[in-house]
Amino acid sequence: MKFWRFVQILFFLGVAAVGLVVAVMIANADDTTLFDRMQLPDGDPNKLNYYIQPAPNGNEKVPFPTIFDPASVYLSLVVPAYNEEKRLPKMLDETLNYLKSREEKDKSFTWEIVIVNDGSKDKTKEVVLNYAKEYPNIFLLNQPVNMGKGAAIQAGCLHVRGELVLMLDADGATKIDDFEVLEKEIKSLMKTTNQAIVIGSRAQNEKAKRTPLRKFLSIGMHTLIVLSGVHGIRDTQCGFKLFTRESCKMIFMNQHVQRWCCDPEILVIARRLGMKISELPVEWNEIDGSKMKISGMIKMATDLIKIAIFHRVGAWKIRDRRH
């Protein structure tokens, strides 16, 4: 009898401890987003305010466009890149071949590629600038330190010119040809709303080749993702997502998570704003050199817990941060 009494006491103490930890987390939740920091005065070292473009006598600093301006091209591609000097050229070559082919068939198909160098330690920056010398609609957004995949995507998506905005990974795991699948679907959704997202799904595609370990980890993370508030989506982590300009604006000025777990938060924000979300299969292949480690998985799980708690209790607010 004393033993079970002891177990009960331990249980209630455990619950109280968890409750205390959650309360402390909520009390210390930072509602500041990367968008807020981009509104800092000029001269503040934390402010990102220009692209880097090749110029005849060196590199030129080109002022950012803003997501709040009217679109001036049809499609913006946002590519987060961290130490991608080896894999980025192949992806860019394939992407450019596709874009040029579309452009030749349809002169109204205008585009830009925004590559966000997330504090790379290799020659990613130089690779991008070499391509930008040949293609003036390739832009480099250079983050001087590594801020995380989420921060890179957010910075890129807040400073694009496109009517449509496509997220894609630098490793080329998803082929650019599948853009047309997402494009057709989002145009259908845009008949009734200007806030829509179409996401690529590896889970629905039999062609996807994934190792048993990746499948096991994916199942575990998916369980946490459902608990964080994302329902009805089989694959949140695929880096192939297409946004309307309006959905891009509303989501990324409210995004808080700056590392690997940005994808579930993007969908949580979209759900809370009542956006239409569609999921379609895309061809995907696992690429050597993936950088997700066990420590990254732990950080991702922590961020999922924050998403689940902070968005539900209002510690992370969704609002028009321009005002």
Curated annotation (Swiss-Prot):
SUPFAM superfamilies the UniProt entry points to: Nucleotide-diphospho-sugar transferases
Residue numbers on the Cytoplasmic membrane side: 27-323
Reactions accelerated catalytically: a di-trans,poly-cis-dolichyl phosphate + UDP-alpha-D-glucose = a di-trans,poly-cis-dolichyl beta-D-glucosyl phosphate + UDP
Entry's transmembrane regions: 6-26
Cellular component annotations (GO), alphabetically ordered: endoplasmic reticulum membrane
Topology of this chain in the membrane: Single-pass membrane protein
Ranges of the Lumenal topological domain: 1-5
Enzyme class: transferase
Gene Ontology terms, MF aspect: dolichyl-phosphate beta-glucosyltransferase activity
Cell compartment(s), UniProt: Endoplasmic reticulum membrane
Protein's job: Dolichyl-phosphate beta-glucosyltransferase involved in the glycosylation of glycoproteins through the synthesis of dolichyl beta-D-glucosyl phosphate which serves as a sugar donor for transfer of three glucose residues to the Man-9-GlcNAc-2-PP-dolichol precursor to N-glycans.
Protein family: Belongs to the glycosyltransferase 2 family.
Family annotation (PANTHER family): DOLICHYL-PHOSPHATE BETA-GLUCOSYLTRANSFERASE (PTHR10859:SF91), GLYCOSYL TRANSFERASE (PTHR10859)
UniProt name for this protein: Dolichyl-phosphate beta-glucosyltransferase ALG5A
Organism the protein comes from: Trichomonas vaginalis (strain ATCC PRA-98 / G3)
